[in-house]
Structure formats: C-alpha cells, structure tokens
C-alpha cells in the first residue's frame, strides 16, 4: 500500500475508534502513566515555554506538561485525526486547562514555523506513521536550539502480551493484518533501541537516549479485555466489527484460555514493554 493510501486508511480507522478512546481515556492513561511521566520529565517543560504534543489522541500526556507550563506557557495538543482533537479539546476544558490549544496537525508536515517550540512529545504514535523519517525531520525543524523531544513506541510483540494475546487469537481465526506490523507504519516498527537511535540520528539529532519501561495493563476479566482491546485498536476494531456472534465465540474460545496465565487477584494483568527515546 502506498504511503498516502496507508495514511488515509489509518485516518479512517482511528476516526472510528476515537469515541472509545475518549470514553476510556483515564483508564488507558493510568495503565501507561509511567510512560507519560517519563516523556514529560525528559522534555522538561518550564513556565512560559511552548510544548507540542504530536499524535496526542485524547491528550492526557500533554496535559501533564500543561500543568507545569503555567498560565503564560502553551501546550499545543495535536493529532491528525479530527475526532481525537475534539476529544482532547473537551478533556482540556474539563480540567480547566486554559493554556492548551488543540489542533489538527500532520506530524509529517507540521504547520508551525522553524524553531517555534521548546519541546515535543509523542506517546505511541510515531511508529504508526509510514513516513516516520519525515516526521522526525519536522520535529527537529520546529524545535528551538536546546529543545528536546521525547517519544514512546512499543517494544517487540513477545514482550507485549497485552496486545499479542489478542492478535494471536485473531490470526488463528482468519484475520489478515492490513500490513506487516514490523514495517514502517506498523505497531512494532520501532520496537528496538537501535531502530530508534538510527531514526533520530538520521534526522540530525546528536544527543539520543533510549531506555525500556515495563508495566502491566489491568482488566477485570476476559470479557473486559475483549471489549476494551477490540474497541480502541483501529485495524482490529474494523475486523471484529464485521464478525457475527458465532465467529466471535470461536475467537474467544482461542483467546480466553491464553489469558489464564495472566490472572491476578480476580482480574487480569498483561505485561507491556515500551521503548522510550529522548533526543536533542
């Protein structure tokens, strides 16, 4: 699939699941709060600065930064999906954050002047951009001298049972992924430290730091896991939405036993591993 077609299909899919993201925003955020905190800590927002969040979704990571910027600072919360931007706008209003501007921005063509922001954040979005090299060049262009960018991607599939268990069950029951998940634009396309170092260096960043963070996604039950996971993952939601009840039952017969090793205290805890990168 050509990059333009891939981007348009991604826009359609993520527009479809934006309401589910908004409905579960706090829960999704808490499951990976440590990632958002790492990113904000490494961008080091200060009063009066301007921070840009790309691929922000409903915006929770950026809202952490906004609380450190003070009334004279500014957070630009952005996503290329308009319905996600609308969700972020509502979230900022609910939190009384008057220093947040929500905008539709394509990370590969950032509509901001050169040297115009003090920091850039992106949590779990950069790997989904087919032209990620262009996106990182754009990040470097808009960063002021001395500014920092911090972003997070998912580690390898075997280290992320929170999604691997679902994907494995779907694959065993007829799902064909829309593309190679390790190729540019795929969920696991930036799943190693080396790939992220190469990406940053290719855009001209000299100061690159890469770490791994681990945690767990918590679910009340296999039913809860199925409902939430299939409602917020764009390509998966597409496939599951086309299934009949009997087909869902067949997939669940594969999935539910695979979740048994992750049962904890009456619920489920599925591990995740994230690659976090800070560049300047």
Task: List the predicted regions and their residue ranges.
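Class I SAM-dependent methyltransferase SAM/SAH-binding core
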Residues: 50-110, 134
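Conserved Class I S-adenosyl-L-methionine
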Residues: 3-10, 20, 24-25, 29-32, ...
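A short acidic, Gly/Pro-enriched loop at the edge of an enzyme's catalytic core
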Residues: 108-119
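Conserved hydrophobic residues forming the short capping helix/wall of the S-adenosyl-L-methionine
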Residues: 69, 91-92, 170, 200, ...
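A short SAM/SAH-binding and catalytic strip from SAM-dependent methyltransferases
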Residues: 118-132, 155
């Amino acid at each position: 699939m050509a990059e333009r077609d891939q981007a348009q299909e991604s826009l359609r899919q993520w527009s479809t699941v934006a309401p589910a993201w908004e409905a579960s925003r706090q829960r999704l955020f808490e499951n990976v709060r440590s990632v958002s905190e790492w990113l904000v800590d490494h961008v080091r927002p200060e009063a009066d600065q301007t921070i840009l969040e790309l691929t922000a979704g409903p915006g929770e990571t950026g809202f952490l930064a906004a609380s450190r910027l003070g009334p004279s600072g500014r957070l630009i919360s952005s996503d290329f999906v308009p319905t996600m931007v609308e969700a972020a706008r509502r979230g900022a209003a609910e939190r009384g954050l008057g220093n947040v501007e929500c905008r539709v921005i394509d990370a590969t063509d950032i509509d901001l002047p050169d040297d115009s922001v003090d920091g850039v954040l992106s949590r779990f979005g950069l790997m989904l951009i087919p032209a990620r090299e262009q996106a990182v060049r754009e990040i470097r262009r808009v960063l002021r001298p001395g500014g920092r960018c911090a972003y997070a991607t998912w580690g390898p599939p075997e280290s992320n049972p929170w999604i691997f268990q679902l994907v494995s069950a779907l694959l065993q029951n007829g799902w064909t992924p829309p593309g190679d998940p390790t190729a540019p634009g795929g969920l696991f396309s930036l799943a190693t430290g080396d790939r992220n170092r190469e990406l940053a260096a290719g855009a001209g960043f000299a100061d690159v730091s890469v770490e791994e963070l681990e945690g767990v996604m918590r679910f009340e039950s296999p039913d809860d896991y199925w409902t939430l996971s299939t409602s917020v993952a764009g390509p998966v939601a597409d496939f599951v939405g086309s299934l009949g009840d009997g087909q869902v039952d067949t997939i669940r017969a594969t999935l539910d036993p695979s979740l048994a090793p992750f049962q904890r205290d009456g619920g489920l805890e599925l591990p995740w591993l994230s690659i976090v990168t800070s560049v300047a």
